Design a protein with these regions (language model features):
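Contiguous N-terminal and early-domain "leader" segments and peripheral loops that mark the onset or edge
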Residues: 1-3, 154
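Cys-nucleophile CN-hydrolase/nitrilase-fold catalytic domain and related Cys-dependent amidase chemistry
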Residues: 3-84, 90, 99, 161-167
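Structural motif
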Residues: 17-18, 129, 153
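Short hydrophobic/aromatic-enriched beta-strand-loop microsegments
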Residues: 38-39, 153-157
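Active-site catalytic loop in hydrolytic enzyme cores
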Residues: 69-149, 157-167
């Protein structure tokens, strides 16, 4: 079970202040899978991440997960939890990754995901941080906007691979 694996590994590094998980850590990273794995905010995966942050006393940048909203739209959403398990940030990926690699892989997040339209910045005792997701990082304006809101560093949960990374 993925959540058991995540907890086992958070336990190994529980003396850390921050733990970060990868993009779509809780489901196979294929656009066709996102609807089946999508949960409403505060669903099972969200609850588990909140509990792990509290149990191990860490800030948890909980990678990303497919989030379904009340209109049925699905977003690639990142949540950040503080040491008490409280959600302190939520960010929905705004730059969806659509690619057709010549002679190779084809992947279109926009087939199933909806783009977000906000930025996320959060405060900790270590400073102010921003969060964006994977392909978003290639758009410097997003980082600039986070910096203008006080972000001193940016978390970037990502799932680049050897094919999509250079693309």
């Amino acid at each position: 079970d993925t959540l058991e694996y995540v907890e086992k590994n958070i336990q190994k590094v529980s003396d850390a202040d921050f733990v970060t998980l990868p993009e779509m850590f809780c489901c196979p990273y294929e656009a066709k899978n996102f609807p089946a794995y999508a949960e409403y905010e505060k669903g099972e995966v969200w609850q588990a991440c909140s509990l792990m942050a509290k149990k191990y006393g860490v800030y948890l940048s909980a990678g990303t997960m497919p989030e379904r909203d009340s209109d049925g739209k699905i977003f690639n959403t990142a949540y950040v939890f503080d040491r008490n398990g409280s959600q302190i940030a939520k960010y929905r990926k705004s730059h969806l990754f659509d690619i057709d690699v010549k002679g190779g892989q084809s992947f279109h997040e926009s087939d199933t995901l909806t783009a977000g339209d906000s930025i996320a910045v959060f405060d900790t005792e270590f400073g102010t941080f921003g969060i964006c997701i994977c392909y978003d990082f290639r758009f410097p304006e997003l980082g600039r906007l986070m910096a203008l809101k006080g972000a001193q560093a940016i978390f970037v949960p990502a799932a680049f691979n050897m094919t999509t990374g250079p693309a």
